[in-house]
Amino acid sequence: LTCILKRYKNRRLKQKGMETLMEVLKDKDCTINTPVVLGVQDSPIYGKGISIKPRVDGRKDSKHFENIYLPELLPLEEYDLIVVLISGGKDSIACFYKLLELGVPKEKIELWHHDIDGGHPSRRMDWKCTQNYMKALADAEGVKLRVSYRVNGFFGELYRIGASEPVEWVDPDTGEIKQCKLSSNYLKCQEIKEQCLEEMEDLLKEYGCRMKFPAKSPDLSRRWCSAYLKVMVADSVVSNLDRLEELGGKRHKFPAKGGTHQGRWCSGNLKAAVQDSVTANLEETKKDKKILIVSGERRGESAGRSKYNEIEIHRTNAEKRNHRIVHQWRCCIDYTEKDVWEVLKRHHVNPHPCYRLGWNRCSCAACIFSTPGLMKGFSEIYPDEYKELRDDEERLGFTLDNKKNLDDFICGAKSCLCLDDKQAVHSIKTGEFTVDDIFVDDWKYPVGAFHGSDGGSC
């Protein structure tokens, strides 16, 4: 233990008049032989009036951090709802089981999963099996799963002109799709699109009226549905694109590999903004509620995350306006990777199939932070999707990587892909994953474990 602790990197967080010494074991230094320290089973505290304090006091080194500073959480039983933001990755799953070990009743917990693809009709950025993996976990544990998304997801946002698509979620009790309040810019863009159709109709009338069904003929002058209702509609929309762009902007480029959500819009617009919209619009969380948001960021993942607060006031907190208290708890922030795997091992949870094929992080399948080896693996397991991304680069004139196109990016790289786990290969390729697959008696570390944290969100 002493030898391993010597490899810890000391980090100091400057706070008002004091420095807090932190010992952080980076994921790249964590191995299968690293001792389990924080990942041991927790003792129940729910219902005992115990407030949770952070292991390291929160930052107060700027106005922003002063505003969100929180010295301690409420006792867990005082929250009306505890939301676990869950991606399917090991860290967020460990958060869920930590809550159970602390004694939180399952009926008090909801798993919130943000579907990065948003029901896009043809394109996918995430793993094919992630949605079924999440459903299998929720069903196996008997907890509610609330899936939320921005309509048309990553590729809808990538090719966006005008305002972003609305945020929707699926009610876990009824299966009904609910929609958050539409933005004023989105409504204005819709008006422009409807105006296009009206202008097209007026234009058609100048050349005569049909008032009869199209003929079943290869002659487009008689099969007028194709000629007048597709080609001309497209032309009308194109003529109004400048106005749409003026109202809502446009993307037409991949997210930046930066630390801010503005440039890295996949995290900002498809995850954080989605979660905030659902919290503010959901009847169960809208007002007169105390909510705890639990997420799985860890200090060992990156230099940026090493500076995160364990607890803080969440950005959707609205005590004055809606009497809504929202706190955030990164309950595994000080865990090592070994600690996290220990939690999954203790509960016999089958890791997401991507870990079992060699991926060290459960991000999107084609995550913008992928290393050359990870992207090489993606090109091998999903060759069609890889080709589509290359076509996107050509079409947009903008590469996924900051400096080179995908072919150059992966050239000469050693693929991460390991095909030994046939069940995982099947799940990744087909998307199939059932309740019967979620627990395993003979638990083993996946091949992607202990390969550092490069290749995922930082």
Task: Label the predicted regions.
Residues 3-8, 12-458:
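Nucleotide-activated chemistry modules centered on ATP-dependent adenylation/adenylyltransferase
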